[in-house]
């Protein structure tokens, strides 16, 4: 997935999701201040997406509907979305990935039907995801806060990945 980097860090009673703002079309930067991290479900869930923007918005709308159907059950809503995404002929062609988090869980949702919970308190997606993930993992044992780790990881990813910029949007929730 090109065009962005999204990371989630869970540490010190906080869950932070951060994403850059670059939108690319081929080799051209079309926009530098897109908002790819947002709140859902009355602010109780944060979500970030990488991939085709229209596809991601379709999936965010579907996730919002699943959260209304299964209130306060992010895992259940994510699994139901992943099942629909994988089995629905229309949705199957959508090209995006999502990170979602609430007070209790962080999940990556893919079009392959995967719903993955990170093992080490952090997970990242997108073209710069591997760089951000490695940077965050290296910083998890430091005295930095979850937000500081997320911002630094995106800064490093933005220095390396041509599809990631330094215009960072951050959303934070209290974690359990």
Curated annotation (Swiss-Prot):
Its EC number is 3.4.25.2. It is found in: Cytoplasm. Protease subunit of a proteasome-like degradation complex believed to be a general protein degrading machinery. Allosterically activated by HslU binding. One of its GO terms (cellular component) is proteasome core complex. Na(+) binds at residues 158, 161, 164. Keywords: Allosteric enzyme, Cytoplasm, Hydrolase, Metal-binding, Protease, Sodium, Threonine protease. GO terms for biological process: proteolysis involved in protein catabolic process. It catalyses: ATP-dependent cleavage of peptide bonds with broad specificity. The active site is at residue 4. It comes from Rhizobium meliloti (strain 1021). A double ring-shaped homohexamer of HslV is capped on each side by a ring-shaped HslU homohexamer. The assembly of the HslU/HslV complex is dependent on binding of ATP. This is ATP-dependent protease subunit HslV. Belongs to the peptidase T1B family. HslV subfamily. Pfam families: Proteasome. CDD domains: protease_HslV (cd01913).
